[in-house]
Amino acid sequence: VQLSGEEKAAVLALWDKVNEEEVGGEALGRLLVVYPWTQRFFDSFGDLSNPAAVMGNPKVKAHGKKVLHSFGEGVHHLDNLKGTFAQLSELHCDKLHVDPENFRLLGNVLVVVLARHFGKDFTPELQASYQKVVAGVANALAHKYH
């Protein structure tokens, strides 16, 4: 990911304030609500029948936290995203057969959730930096598909 030193510092400073459980649960929940076809990868999660069920589902929240924790690993290793996400890329490609477009969708949903949580602190400049980061993470996760 091509970020200036200032952009990296801003991304890391915001990330240090992120509540992984809260933001992760909301981001994954929103992905499943906004793009309902993504629910097919989460058959074992129980009731995903409506937005309230999805957003209140403890398995969605728990997996969202796990996803966001992994994303945070990427934030701290921006110069080696492919290496950081190599195993997850392999898992999602070879075993789970997740459409790599879903990584881009989740990244965009995450940016929306960050904006919601951080309000005016999530400036257009910071959004631009995070868009670069989520695109880089999505590309790293899609790496094994090529």
UniProtKB/Swiss-Prot annotation:
Gene Ontology CC annotations of this record: blood microparticle; haptoglobin-hemoglobin complex; hemoglobin complex
Biological processes annotated in GO = hydrogen peroxide catabolic process
Pfam families in the record, alphabetically? Globin (PF00042)
The family database entries (PROSITE patterns) matched by this protein are listed as: GLOBIN
Expression (tissue specificity): Red blood cells.
Which keywords annotate this record?
Acetylation, Heme, Iron, Metal-binding, Oxygen transport, Phosphoprotein, S-nitrosylation, Transport
Domain (Globin): give its ranges: 2-146
Name positions with the PTM S-nitrosocysteine. Answer: 93
UniProt modified residues of type Phosphoserine: 44
Modified positions (N6-acetyllysine) are: 59, 82, 144
Task: List, alphabetically, the InterPro entries matched.
Answer: Globin, Globin-like_sf, Globin/Proto, Hemoglobin_b, Hemoglobin_oxygen_transport
Q: Which residues bind heme b?
A: 63, 92
Carrying N-acetylvaline, the residues are 1
Q: Which is one GO molecular function term here?
A: metal ion binding
Among its keywords, does the record have Metal-binding?
yes
Q: What does this protein do?
A: Involved in oxygen transport from the lung to the various peripheral tissues.
Q: Partners and quaternary state? A: Heterotetramer of two alpha chains and two beta chains.
Q: What family classification does the UniProt entry report for this protein?
A: Belongs to the globin family.
- Matching PANTHER family: HEMOGLOBIN FAMILY MEMBER, HEMOGLOBIN SUBUNIT BETA
This chain belongs to the protein called: Hemoglobin subunit beta
